[in-house]
Amino acid sequence: MSGGGKDRIAVFPSRMAQTLMKTRLKGAQKGHSLLKKKADALNLRFRDILRKIVENKVLMGEVMKEAAFSLAEAKFTAGDFSHTVIQNVSQAQYRVRMKKENVVGVFLPVFDAYQDGPDAYDLTGLGKGGANIARLKKNYNKAIELLVELATLQTCFITLDEAIKVTNRRVNAIEHVIIPRIENTLTYIVTELDEMEREEFFRMKKIQANKKKLKEQEAAQKALEGPGPGEDAAHSENNPPRNLLASEEDNLPVLFN
């Protein structure tokens, strides 16, 4: 039997092994197709997140610039109120909660900023500069929400990048390693089975030829040895000896009348 130098799975060539390899090949091809679709979906989401990151970073610069101007205006009209805010801080009003979004089997973290309870500084700037302080709070709240959204996008970007790399490695492994190995194994099994069938056919023909030759030799040997004693007795019973006198008397000419 041929050994085969190609990379293949070590199996004994049989019909059962051929069926199992066909099943494994079908499963590998289906898995390859599903992983390709998963990689395409992840790449689509990855590009969408990348576009949003670029847009949010541009928007973030404008929002932070507007918030900085609002802070300068509020300090100009209401004076330095930072010590008042620091003294009255008990807990953060804006909190961040996290949830997970499933994208074709990859869980992406999503951060959400929300205000916990009523605004404790609603009356800040009531004496002077109230409008500027209100605008300041609004701008910084917008900046916080945008920062949280940007953090979500960047975290999803990193997670998707790693998931895409892993998926592509799996796709390449199935396409260039697993499927060729199974195909080489199937080729080896089919070749070995065909060779075994040819060997079996040749062996059967050889056995038949030997039997025929043996029969011919036995027949020739019997012909050389002649009939046996049993065969002579049977021949005598079937063909009794002739009466030569009786036959000769019948054929004698009549000499006397």
From Swiss-Prot:
PANTHER family under this entry?
V-TYPE ATP SYNTHASE SUBUNIT D (PTHR11671)
Q: Span of the secretion signal?
A: none
Disulfide feature: none
A cellular component term from Gene Ontology for this protein is: proton-transporting V-type ATPase complex
| Function of the protein | Subunit of the V1 complex of vacuolar(H+)-ATPase (V-ATPase), a multisubunit enzyme composed of a peripheral complex (V1) that hydrolyzes ATP and a membrane integral complex (V0) that translocates protons. V-ATPase is responsible for acidifying and maintaining the pH of intracellular compartments and in some cell types, is targeted to the plasma membrane, where it is responsible for acidifying the extracellular environment.
Pfam families referenced in this protein's UniProt entry, alphabetically = ATP-synt_D (PF01813)
Q: Origin organism of this chain?
A: Caenorhabditis elegans
Q: Which UniProt keywords apply?
A: Hydrogen ion transport, Ion transport, Transport
Q: Where is this region: Disordered?
A: 215-257
The record's Gene3D superfamilies line, in alphabetical order, gives: 1.10.287.3240
Q: Which protein are we looking at?
A: V-type proton ATPase subunit D
MF terms in GO: proton-transporting ATPase activity, rotational mechanism
- Say which family it is in: Belongs to the V-ATPase D subunit family.
Per UniProt, subunit arrangement is: V-ATPase is a heteromultimeric enzyme made up of two complexes: the ATP-hydrolytic V1 complex and the proton translocation V0 complex. The V1 complex consists of three catalytic AB heterodimers that form a heterohexamer, three peripheral stalks each consisting of EG heterodimers, one central rotor including subunits D and F, and the regulatory subunits C and H. The proton translocation complex V0 consists of the proton transport subunit a, a ring of proteolipid subunits c9c'', rotary subunit d, subunits e and f, and the accessory subunits vah-19/Ac45 and vah-20/PRR.
One biological process term from GO is: regulation of intracellular pH
